Amino acid sequence: METQNHTTVTEFILLGLTESSTLRVILFMVFLGIYTVTLVGNFSIISLIRSCPQLHTPMYLFLSHLAFVDIGFSTSITPTMFKGFLGNRLVLSVAACIAQFCITVTFGTVECFLLAVMAYDRYVAICSPLLYSTHMSPRICFLLVGASYVGGCVNSGAFTSCLSILSFCGPNQIDHFFCDFPAVLKLSCSDVSIIGIIPSISAGSIIVITVFVIAVSYAYILITILKMRSTEGRQKAFSTCTSHLTAVTLYYGTITFIYVMPKSNYSTAQNKILSVFYTVVIPMLNPLIYSLRNRDVKEALRKAIIRIFP
């Protein structure tokens, strides 16, 4: 009988986006700019909503939490990318890798639930305006936000529980810029036949549930808008939804390709590009989408600028 000696892996090497030192410098500058805009934009949204009484409504409460989640989502990955750009290689311990993935999944899942909550909020505001204060009371808003964070933690716990029971005794190079579940799973020497389908089941279930809420909400919204006789009323109703629909399309479209579609449909390079888009670019775009396409936010921003620079 042959005895195979396995060395337990205690750390992973993340290969990042490129091996070219020149490209790493360029990418560092690009992502530094993106991360700066992400922080400034989302912190500005949070500060603006907190400081402007006219934005103290459920819709903007949810938007402020979305901005906070985008900050956490981007921060869970981008600073680690900077280390990889500035060094020859990025090394993370197994525990640090699992922790990074845990945080990333938490914020990513919370964003899914918040987008669904925001769709429900628009449904109540447009379809049942007289009952809005009752259906979206401070207590209900608190419960909806709290449930979003709890859902994120539960989903993250399921993923990290699977990772924590895996053994790693072979190659330790992850062909990615962060510790994503499929990339880490490839390096395990444990039986992953069951664990390997968990990302699609878990992410797919959350996507189906939240997309169902969003789709039903907007179906009723569309019916209500089409029944409106006033053109101005239609335009106002549409204007409150376009920003949210844009954010939903960008986010759900990307994560569906990554975590639900069969991996044979796209290459590792394409996976990295899509991952960059939803983990780094979208958190930067959300505050721009909501500020540039929202009259209330633009007006509050104008007043805030006047107060600062009279």
UniProtKB/Swiss-Prot annotation:
Extracellular-side positions: 1-25, 76-99, 155-196, 259-271
Membrane topology: Multi-pass membrane protein
All ranges on the Cytoplasmic side of the membrane: 47-54, 121-133, 218-237, 293-310
Glycan-bearing residues: 5, 265
Location(s), subcellular: Cell membrane
GO function term, MF aspect, one: G protein-coupled receptor activity
GO cellular component: membrane; plasma membrane
Taxonomic superkingdom: Eukaryota
Keyword Membrane: yes
Record PROSITE patterns: G_PROTEIN_RECEP_F1_1, G_PROTEIN_RECEP_F1_2
Keyword terms: Cell membrane, Disulfide bond, G-protein coupled receptor, Glycoprotein, Membrane, Olfaction, Receptor, Sensory transduction, Transducer, Transmembrane, Transmembrane helix
Pfam families: 7tm_4 (PF13853)
Membrane-traversing stretches: 26-46, 55-75, 100-120, 134-154, 197-217, 238-258, 272-292
GO biological process, one term: sensory perception of smell
Intrachain S-S bonds: 97-189
Assigned protein family: Belongs to the G-protein coupled receptor 1 family.
UniProt function note: Potential odorant receptor.
Name used for this protein in its record: Olfactory receptor 5P55
Organism: Mus musculus
